[in-house]
Amino acid sequence: MTQPKRIISNPCLQLKTLASELAECLRSLLIHGGYTINEDDIYISIIYKFHDFKNWKQTDSLYSEKGLETDEVVNNPKTTFSATLNSKNGIIFYNSKQEAFDKGEYIPDNCDKYDSNGKLLGSILCYRIICKKNAIDYITAIISITTYDKTLVSKKAPKSVIDNVKYNIEKHILSAFEKRISIELCLLYLSELNIRKKEMKLVSKSHKKISLKEQEH
């Protein structure tokens, strides 16, 4: 009888690809009235934590040299990450990083740029994903969308336009990508559980060998 084909999955690579596709979708959405933003201007990272695993981790990014270290982002209560993690709606968008900084919800990194008045340039948007079952949060992740020069929406745009862009990003782009990202995070979680299981077996075998040697003596 023919055996079923083995499914080969690389969730880390898939998540990196999804980040690139997300950046392209955002670039297309943000073209408005002659205002454009390049895909390369948008930096996307995904920081996640699995149930029963101690540390937060960051997926492979397209520009890994940018941004704060994961520990800096997670452990500082004044980051947009922390604000989003604890927010009611699970999404925070500042078209102006300076506004986020002034409100104590952004920490500049070494890639941030400033205007002639010393004000931060660019935008920051964070979006929370939770995968749960039976009231247990098995996976928690924050998607961070950052620009370091141009804002996601023109600085001249009224608040109503900015709010509309936020709505469209959340409802028409992030909600769609959330499904794919959640699937890949679940596959990554299962992979990590499998690795942990193998490590525990090796430790158990090692302890048994030590115990047998001690008994022989």
Language model feature labels by segment:
Residues 11-31, 77, 159-179:
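Well-ordered, non-membrane alpha-helical segments in soluble/globular domains
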Residues 1-61, 185-217:
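Intrinsically disordered, low-complexity terminal regulatory regions
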